From Swiss-Prot:
Residues 460-487 have a biased composition (Polar residues). GO terms for molecular function: protein-macromolecule adaptor activity; ubiquitin protein ligase binding. Belongs to the arrestin family. PalF/RIM8 subfamily. One of its GO terms (biological process) is ubiquitin-dependent endocytosis. This is pH-response regulator protein palF/RIM8. One of its GO terms (cellular component) is plasma membrane. InterPro entries: Arrestin-like_C, Arrestin-like_N, Arrestin_C-like, Arrestin_domain-protein, Ig_E-set. SMART domains: Arrestin_C (SM01017). Residues 518-530 have a biased composition (Basic and acidic residues). The lineage of its organism: Eukaryota, Fungi, Dikarya, Ascomycota, Saccharomycotina. Gene3D superfamilies: 2.60.40.640. Present with 784 molecules/cell in log phase SD medium. Keywords: Isopeptide bond, Ubl conjugation. Residues 235-258 have a biased composition (Low complexity). It comes from Saccharomyces cerevisiae (strain ATCC 204508 / S288c) (Baker's yeast). The gene is RIM8.
Length: 542
């Protein structure tokens, strides 16, 4: 008897069915006892990333166990923003807001309009009156809904503290519930991805950012000069009485000038915005007052800053930092010019998302390029795995021959044909680190370390292809001599290959059966010629 009661209790409770990632819930009305067998949304292109002003086509499929009457099927396009706020994991609050909701009826639209008549006081349909119905079995309702466009549209995104989600929601409602006071009888959802294009070609060109460093003695000298200028009116009144004293002080000041200890750091970026997947060229120039060398003196990092708003007005905003990629280069101040110029590269990874600032009350994402300059040889730069960056030259000899071979091959390719590396970013990406990077926050705390931060915009499109260096450095940035094939052969040949004209070089035919790598054929050919030249000439008198 108790088992029968338990069975009746379970049959009365509302049920939830999860099928193909879609959840359908059914209430205790005319569709109770699980009368809907399956309810789902099929999209014609389920894996496509949609853009605003594009139309999504598909069909809503519902499988019913028995005949039902007086129902309507509504399809809605919804954009929902979710964010988790709170410092501790146990006290996280969720904020949910729908920024977009566009609805249309797939079935029963005419009866819904009749029930919502303005003259009718009670929008109620009698249960005995049959307006429409669906028979037992599977029913398919095709649809075509357009994604709106405008300034309020957002790109789909999911991260640890929040998300922007687009989904299609299809509900099966009773005509008695057209006022929305009760929950829908059945519901299913289907998510899809939307990306809002962000054009970076129309952004203004950024100005060169400069940082000037001066010694403490020079700063104190400037303060003294400013105080002297403020008291110039008083000194003019007493100029006649203190002529001798002022002249002697001026002579002393001229004889002991302070040394000019000024360091100027200039950073220039060709554009203010870059696309996802592009390489960012950064020009760095340093004017120093003395020769200087640091093996890990220049650290450039692409940083993403995420700001998450609080649940209330009084709650503080949380800030999270994420280092995307990093490049480390040495600094060498030329003793003659006392200058250093270099171009470093960073890359926007393909899995990055564009800059987002329109959802400021929830969260925002901004990108910055941080350039840190280490002006001290005593500072040791460590990575996250405690690996030292900038080891001496003597310690680098034991790293293996593979890195040296790769560098030689790249140099040879650039000399033979510079275009081979122009479209291949492997040569530039080899100096970009995506893991085991230097902690920039710790680097800032060291002495004689300075830098700057430049905001950049990460977008998705570039309508105007500009001539400046944007994604990949141009051919002019690669300093390679334009050698003709004959000059290149002369350069590759040994010095004594064509000196002796007495001994003729015999002809030979290469063996096609032997598989030799293409890059080593010329080298093997030269060795063979040298061996043949070193053999003694044949003697006919023997």
């Amino acid at each position: 008897m108790s088992l029968l009661r338990l069975w009746n209790k379970e049959s009365r409770a509302p049920s939830k069915i999860k099928s193909h990632g879609i959840v359908g819930s059914y209430g205790n009305s005319m569709l109770a006892h699980n009368n809907v067998k399956q309810f789902r949304i099929d999209i014609d292109e389920p894996h496509r990333v949609w853009k605003p002003n594009e139309s999504i086509t598909g069909e809503a499929v519902i499988d019913i166990k028995r005949d039902i009457t007086n129902v309507a099927i509504k399809l809605s396009l919804v954009c929902e923003v979710r964010v988790k706020t709170g410092n501790s994991p146990t006290s996280k609050n969720k904020r949910i807001e729908k920024t977009l909701e566009k609805s249309t009826f797939l079935y029963g639209q005419d009866y819904v309009k009749t029930a919502f008549s303005a003259k009718e006081k009670k929008p109620h349909v009698d249960k005995t009156t049959i307006l429409n119905g669906l028979s037992k079995g599977e029913h398919r309702f095709p649809f075509r809904i357009r994604i709106p466009r405008g300034r309020g549209m957002l790109s789909s995104i999911k991260f640890e503290r929040g998300s922007i989600t687009y989904f299609l929601s299809c509900t099966l409602e009773s005509l008695n519930n057209i006022n929305g006071l009760k929950k829908p009888e059945a519901r299913c959802e289907r998510e899809f991805a939307v990306i809002v294009p962000l054009d970076v070609s129309r952004l203004p060109k950024p100005k060169t950012k400069t940082v000037v460093l001066q010694s403490a003695s020079m700063v104190q000298n400037k303060k003294n000069k400013s105080t002297e200028d403020e008291s110039s009116s008083y000194t003019q009144l007493t100029q006649k009485s203190t002529t001798s004293n002022s002249s002697s002080s001026s002579v002393n000041s001229k004889t002991s000038p302070l040394p000019n200890k000024t360091v100027t750091i200039s950073v220039d970026i060709p554009q203010a915005g870059f696309m996802i997947g592009e390489i960012i060229p950064i020009d760095v120039k340093i004017d120093h007052y003395k020769p200087f060398y640091a093996p890990a003196g220049l650290t450039t990092t692409l940083v993403r800053i995420c700001r998450v708003g609080g649940a209330g007005k009084d709650d503080p905003m949380e800030t999270f930092r994420k280092d995307i990629c990093q490049s480390i280069s040495p600094i060498y101040i030329n003793p003659e010019t006392l200058q250093f110029q270099s171009r470093v590269y960073l890359k926007v990874p393909l899995d990055a998302f564009s800059t987002l600032t329109t959802v400021g009350k929830f969260f925002s994402f901004q990108y910055y390029i941080e350039v840190m300059v280490n002006l001290s040889k005593k500072n040791v730069v460590y990575t996250e795995s405690n690996r030292i960056i900038g080891t001496p030259i003597g310690e680098q000899n034991g790293l293996g021959v593979e890195n040296n071979i790769n560098r030689i091959q790249r140099k040879m390719l650039r000399m033979v044909n510079p275009e081979t590396l122009e479209n291949d970013s492997e040569g530039y990406e080899s100096s970009i680190f995506f893991k085991d990077m230097v902690n920039v926050e710790k680097l800032k705390r060291l002495r004689n370390v300075t830098g700057m931060s430049i905001e950049t915009v990460i977008g998705t499109t570039r309508s105007e292809q500009q001539q400046s260096d944007a994604s990949i450095p141009s051919q002019s940035s690669i300093t390679a001599p334009q050698n003709s094939p004959s000059n290149l052969r002369d350069w590759l040949a040994p010095l004594n290959a064509y000196d002796s004209d007495d001994v003729p070089v015999p002809k030979y035919s290469p063996n096609d059966k032997v598989s030799v790598p293409s890059e080593d054929k010329q080298e093997l050919e030269q060795k063979r010629l040298q061996q043949l030249e070193s053999d003694p000439p044949p003697c006919d008198d023997y």
